[in-house]
Amino acid sequence: MSLATLDATQHPNLPASAATLFKAKAQNKLSFEQIAQHIGRNEVATAALFYGQAKASPEDIQKLSELLNISPQVLEEQLSGFPDRGRSVEMPPKEPLIYRLYEIVQNYGYAYKAVLNEKFGDGIMSAISFSTKVEKETDADGNNWAVITLRGKWLPFSRF
């Protein structure tokens, strides 16, 4: 199994915790799925912790400390603040997979908006009251398909 690692030169805006966590992840040869199972989170949410895009709870810090053999004091210092979300990716993205996700929004963003507005009315889908997951499907011909589910609470615009 290949594991996701961090090349800090490609991610100059990540917090110090990213280097700490990714180094321990590599040393322990753990996947995000394995780490997620240990800390009781979704694997995308777990990866978001590593990239500094999600807030770690005290329980997350304790469990990560135990699993990754990192001092709880170091993790507490590096993970206890509020995330500075959205700074980790330059726009438009250059990394091909991230660019494809961006391209999906470019190509289908207004189509998603139109369909969502027809179904729910004037509003937005929350990225705060939100969950996501990634699944792998294999079709009858043996082709692998990525299935990304986005689930966000619908927030209607207020009239004032």
Curated annotation (Swiss-Prot):
What biological-process GO terms show up in the record? cyanate metabolic process
SUPFAM superfamilies associated with the record: Cyanase C-terminal domain, lambda repressor-like DNA-binding domains
Record bears the keyword Lyase: yes
Q: Does the keyword Transport apply?
A: no
Catalysed transformations (reactions)? cyanate + hydrogencarbonate + 3 H(+) = NH4(+) + 2 CO2
Listed EC numbers: 4.2.1.104
Q: Where is the active site?
A: R100, E103, S126
What GO MF terms are annotated? cyanate hydratase activity; DNA binding
Q: Which PANTHER family match?
A: CYANATE HYDRATASE
Similarity-based family:
Belongs to the cyanase family.
What is the documented function of this protein? Catalyzes the reaction of cyanate with bicarbonate to produce ammonia and carbon dioxide.
* Protein's recorded name: Cyanate hydratase
User: Which organism is the protein's source?
Assistant: Neosartorya fischeri (strain ATCC 1020 / DSM 3700 / CBS 544.65 / FGSC A1164 / JCM 1740 / NRRL 181 / WB 181) (Aspergillus fischerianus)
Q: Which gene encodes it?
A: cyn1
